[in-house]
Amino acid sequence: MKSRMWATAVAAAAMLAFATVANAGEPEKDGLVYHDATEFLIGGKATQATLTPYDRLPASYEKTTRPELWRHGHHSAGIYVRFRTDSPIIKARWTSYFGAYMNHMSPAGIRGLDLYVLDEGKWYFTGVGRPSRDNKTSEYVLVKNMDRKEREYMLYLSLYDGVTSLEIGVDGASVIGKPQVDSPRRGCPIVMYGTSILQGGCVSRPGMVHTSLIERALDMEVINLGFSGNALLDLDIAQLMASVETPAVYVMDNAPNCKADRIEAHSVEFFRVLRDAHPDVPVVIVEHPLYPTMRLNNVEREDIIARNNAQKAFYEKLRKAGEKRVYYVSGEKLLDEMKDGTVDGDHFTDLGVTYYVKAVLPTIKKALKASPNKVGK
């Protein structure tokens, strides 16, 4: 009886909180009421102690970590905002940290937004926020002409730029508030560390980065710690990963940024930081993808083979030392045999990402079964 009364009280409090947000603010010229996204749930972060709500690295790292790594920490790759609304229209207004541009990636992927809706337990793409070409501040209608019905939404943030402010606009008669459904399930995230590829280079929009595809496939929060050109086995990143309270699985996918000698010199020490903090959490080690350009580029072919040999030796060293909860994904599996999955021979297109997910997901699922930290446990 007491537990039923407590559940009723919690539900009533949740409804009250939901209604309270609904009446805040006055409509602007476009007829919409804008809400600061920090009023809702922000997911996909290893820590909340950041300079801005949408940074990935702790504020304490500003003076201690490498400048290049710190800069990429401002990029909001993998971070999402979860909210619920019955508005027939949803618009976003956001300001980018850098106003970044790259000549081999979609602007929507670099500094746009990506909206998904939860329908019958599955997440579906709903609309993309296209960034302004000339200004750091952008406004875009993500979806419109819907029936007035309460729905759960997830808004993925920019992959290769940061977000300094974000507002969600809904019509004046609507309610909007924090989500009432725990999806992706939080509490025991998968923590993935890697390179520009893991950060999202070079998918068409934020929801297509492979950490987000894995997140939706498993209905589990995934933390994206991809740092373009800077997955160099820095110990402060290992310490950040280790600080996650109840990780389900760690993934080390750093080989594309590490020469063979760096892998040999630093991998075990990086791994030990994770293992000392979480003795039983599985670690998945991923090889360097076999790029299509290896067929003709002799120097690249020899370099990648050397890196993968070093990565395999690292894995085997752990196994010989008695580590049982370590898993390995071969580079041969990461791209389709035809290799039509990159934009420039290195960075993945949406097609390449689907190959990657197909290759790594079975191993991650296997590791999850061995993990002591399970969502809902």
Question: Where do the language-model regions lie?
Answer:
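Catalytic His-Asp segment of secreted/periplasmic serine-dependent ester chemistry enzymes
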Residues: 243, 291-377
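Structural recognition of the beta-strand scaffold that forms the well-ordered cores
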Residues: 189-192, 221-225, 248-253, 282-286, ...
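Oxyanion-hole/transition-state-stabilizing segment in secreted/luminal serine hydrolases
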Residues: 202, 206, 214, 232-277, ...
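N-terminal secretory targeting modules
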Residues: 1-6, 18-189, 366-377
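Cleavable N-terminal signal peptides
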Residues: 11-12, 22
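Catalytic nucleophile-elbow at a beta strand-turn-alpha helix junction centered on a G-D-S/GDSL motif
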Residues: 187-211
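Glycine- and acidic-residue-enriched helix-capping/strand-helix junction motifs
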Residues: 102-106, 200-208, 301-305
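Short helix-loop-beta junction
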Residues: 211-224, 316
